[in-house]
Amino acid sequence: MRTARAGRPALRLVAPHESDAPAPLVSFCSHCGTRPAPGALPNGSRVCGSCCLGLILESRADVAPDADDAFLVLDRSLAVCAVSRAAEQLLDTSEPDAVNRHITELLMPAGAEETGGENLSAAVVWAARGDGAVRTAVVRPANTFGIRLTARIASCGPSPAALLVLD
């Protein structure tokens, strides 16, 4: 163990294991969650060929939503950029009504007394900055009590944004 000048133990940065390879990136639609087959999109197109409503985004395969999963895409100011079809139903909103609203108008941390887990706002900001970590938070719809959802929060792109998948 390293020691500081005064003989006390010192902290040091521990590097991740070299064998921990990051999960591969996959594409998905920001509205329906469908994952297009590689090469299925016309050259330069970013619009989903399945629903024709969402843009194609990328995220880690272990976090990216599956078709019909409930998820939101947020920017670093905690504003909603996209809402999936399943999240519209779950949160009782429509995408045009939800876009550009603050995340706390749709989702809240599930309990103020909980000390474990990540702070929802901090997790979203880190993901929207392009941080490679996957975080989780327990949330509830802002207009409903008694419902708890686990949210997986990670970065997505092409430009850094936060992907919040509700399980």
Each model region followed by its residue ranges:
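Sensory/regulatory domains in signal-transduction proteins
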Residues: 2-40, 44-47, 52-54, 68-70, ...
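PAS-family sensory domains
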Residues: 61-64
